[in-house]
């Protein structure tokens, strides 16, 4: 497969070599490739441009002329230039692409959309923290890539979109992380709709301020969505006015959802043993939806997913029928089992103050005894959220156990101390396996245990080494030990 350089960068150049591939990784360059020399926080891609040319690169994208023996395509924003060039190289994308952003809930919403698209008869796919999954009517789900980055590299995104298109996928939903948006990884995706869930403290190690964090997410609506596309916005979040204003100014149609929403208005929510019943006002009538998932946050996620499906062309009937058939995303309030004396154990991905508060608040109505939580905070990440997580756990759980959760290069005890500073009365058990076992041994009838932080992840990162560790597996083993 070859494409002329001018077709990729959409400008006239003195020369027009044939391009055989596009990458930002000099180690992957092959003869005929277009190499993107991207600026980075620690390493500048320009330092590897000469090496890329030696490996056969036919042209380079950079923010200044590098005086190489091959053409340099100078871009004021080389990351965006790379994303657009990759999209032009790989070409094909599903005809309907939607994205969702927010501090919490992106994985669930992307997965919900894929399930609902497939339920309506469309070959569909989702991309995000859980990898790329394809669902085709009448077939078992296909895992195209394993779990990894929430939003992959722009070149990988473009290639994956081409690949799933060849598999027949017509409807696609992806997570849009703040890192991914800021680093232009989604700039080549042709979006027809995007959703906003919520905004709370996270990733301040990268964005530094909440204002910068919000601006990164706003860019999805301000610059990545075309005029006339649909912005599906959670009206119940405090940041809603900012996202609504950005969407209106950008010429998008705003679809507000939630208790204070207009397009999909949640009128009533009733708890059920196996989920909840939602009364939703939409299209001038009331819809009674039995959602097989627990928690107010899942109702919110479901409404944003429903809005995205409506924006993608699904009927109200197919959309709400799809909500009633949903399966929760792995590691998202996932039930693991029960203790011998009763009590239920769950695993959840909650790793922010708001995420922890949301999960504990969702479980509280189902607790007849004690609510027990095992959690920690990650190393080399936003330190400001650690005491806030501790405060949320101590306030909302009856028993809080602080443990290790990917300490990375930091001293684990120091991270736990930061968390414990906000967690009055919490227990400290550094070894995560022992913490889970201690919590499982406490379970009595009416209790609920939630092991928070990792969700679907299957490793514990300590001093640069990833040790196998699966919260679901460890919680199940802990329950077995209690059973004897």
Can you say where each PLM-predicted feature lies in the sequence?
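Phosphate-binding loop of NTP-binding sites
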Residues: 82-235, 241-252, 366-367, 483
